[in-house]
């Protein structure tokens, strides 16, 4: 699954906007939009950084699921 697909699936599961995801990841809204839509593929170092942020959000999401 690509980073953009992960972002899209995360947003769908959590019913949040691209704007909210950008806020949670401390990223620019246009960055989220471009990656999700396959318009932009970040440089490797940025992709790693963004992937780490997605990993953290998904881990927090899993933690909420087990605490509910």
Q: For each of these PLM feature ranges, what is it?
A:
Residues 12, 26, 37-39:
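Residue-level detection of the helix-turn-helix DNA-binding "recognition helix"
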Residues 5-20, 49, 64:
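Short basic helix-loop element that most often maps to the first helix and adjoining turn
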Residues 25, 35-36, 46, 54:
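DNA major-groove recognition helix of helix-turn-helix
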Residues 66-68:
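Helix-turn-helix/homeodomain-like alpha-helical modules used for DNA recognition
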Residues 43-63:
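DNA major-groove recognition helix of helix-turn-helix/homeodomain DNA-binding modules
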């Amino acid at each position: 699954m690509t980073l953009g697909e992960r972002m899209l699936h995360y947003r769908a599961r959590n019913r949040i906007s691209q704007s909210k995801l950008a806020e949670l990841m401390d990223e620019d809204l246009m960055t989220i939009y471009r990656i999700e839509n396959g318009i932009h593929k970040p440089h490797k170092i940025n992709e790693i950084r963004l992937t780490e942020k997605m990993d953290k959000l998904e881990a927090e999401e899993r933690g909420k699921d087990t605490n509910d």
